[in-house]
Amino acid sequence: ILNEKESELSFAIVQSQTLGIRMGGTSGEITWPPVRLQNPDGSPNYANVSAYAALTGEVVNIPDVYYVEGFNFEGTRRFDAKTGYRSKSMLVVPMRNHENDIIGVLQLINAMDPDTGEVIAFSPESQRLTESLASQAAIALTNNRLIRELENLFEAFIKTIAAAIDEKSPYTAGHIRRVAELTMSIAKRLNEAKDGPFADLHFSDDEMKELRIAAWLHDVGKVTTPEYIVDKATKLETIYDRINT
């Protein structure tokens, strides 16, 4: 997946049925380093096949990576020597979003004959199918990013309102932030409880999100409350106070 600075490709999902490798997503952290799109001198990293596809937008279909010119597969050879694997055919397809911008690449290694199990080259039909899957994956990734960006925008808006409320009075400055932090701290401790009265209580990720938003918004009514009411040292309990408010 292309990072925000568009300077490198980071592995998002890695899976090998032959080697029994599953990394990324719900399968744990990926420890492989990212692929840089530029060389140290600033020139495009066309020697790496994934970087080439991301930079040019071209589909790369290689029958045998050990016998191809124009790309550097030294890292692939080292991996094969270490694991006993034999990387052969490779298909790299750029992933484009709705604006036709490249957001990542889909890389497949070693197509297999369904009848014999022999490693074969990726056929034109397989390439077309993979391009279609890459398009669907790009849509899913873009939608996920848009949702995260909307959530971040919403939270930023909430925190801006909270900051505006805190600025209204020196007596309540930082109150909303402290309440939000305390609320989430209590909720996390409750989730960690293994025994006692709260052992059966557990907040889901969505409930934790709702709780955090509620904590940030608990004083939202103060936005329109006059400063002389916010700063008042006593309760509004006399007839005079009620008439004036």
Q: Locations of the language-model features?
A:
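Amphipathic alpha-helical "output/dimerization" segments
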Residues: D101, T116-T142, K209
